Amino acid sequence: MAIVIVGAGTAGVNAAFWLRQYGYKGGIRLLSRESVTPYQRPPLSKAFLTSETAESAIPLKPESFYTNNNISISLNTQIVSIDVGRKVVAAKDGEEYAYEKLILATGASARRLTCEGSELSGVCYLRSMEDAKNLRRKLVESASVVVLGGGVIGLEVASAAVGIGRRVTVIEAAPRVMARVVTPAAANLVRARLEAEGVGFKLNAKLTSIKGRNGHVNQCVLESGEKIQADLIIVGIGAIPELELATEAALEVSNGVVVDDQMRTSDTSIYAI
């Protein structure tokens, strides 16, 4: 039996690291649905978008870390269910993994658009390395880029895109960018810097639909009636917690997995971080 960690992002990898640091000698198995060893997500919205050379700088830990610390890692492993009675998690391919203790480190997924045209080709999200590589390719092919959302990730993407000569417009529903994370003064400084780089802004603006041509995006339509040319739309409108496993296992959830002061869920054999 082992401690099984579902999710190999920063939280999952560091959980494994600190278990070893604090002397845990039992088995540790990291389960990742991605095809590459665990990596840092923040760089994905920066230099990674415009340079393949940035890829070598983002692993969370060197591969030797997992071997040296006797941590098993299974890639391409999407967990689809938890059998709390048997203490087993099941992967999409049918493989099962028994646990003594289970740690859910499943993170969040990008919030999706639901407006007309949101399923057209050229509407992109940024969450994983695969997303970033796809976006990098599309940036090369696109002249006009619309970034939907004026948060940190959206503005970083806008800066990267304008830096390689793309015409970039940021659409933000709030009266200022980064409204939830910084003061108005700081937000104005960031906006001024990006405007100096060539980024355009539409504030207090709501996207109502996306128009396309031959199945690909070509225009954003705002509530005001204004239309903005777009070869590529990058959506950065927040994230939603991944609760499917916890809900299916009948764990207590409330805008996230409910835990106590030791990160235990309503099932004392399962933790969530």
Task: Name each region found by the language model.
Residues M1-S72, A160-V182:
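Beta1-alpha1 glycine-rich phosphate/pyrophosphate-binding loop at the start
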Residues V6, Y97-G107, I228-G238:
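Short hydrophobic core segments
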Residues S45, I58-P59, S144, I153-S209:
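Rossmann-like dinucleotide-binding cores of NAD(P)H-dependent redox enzymes
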Residues A91, L104-A105, V147, L222, ...:
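Redox-cofactor binding/interface segments in oxidoreductases and associated redox assembly factors
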Residues T106-I164, V259-D261:
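Glycine-rich dinucleotide-binding loop and its adjacent helix/turn
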Residues E119-V140, N214-V221, E226-I273:
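FAD-site-proximal beta/loop scaffold in flavoenzymes
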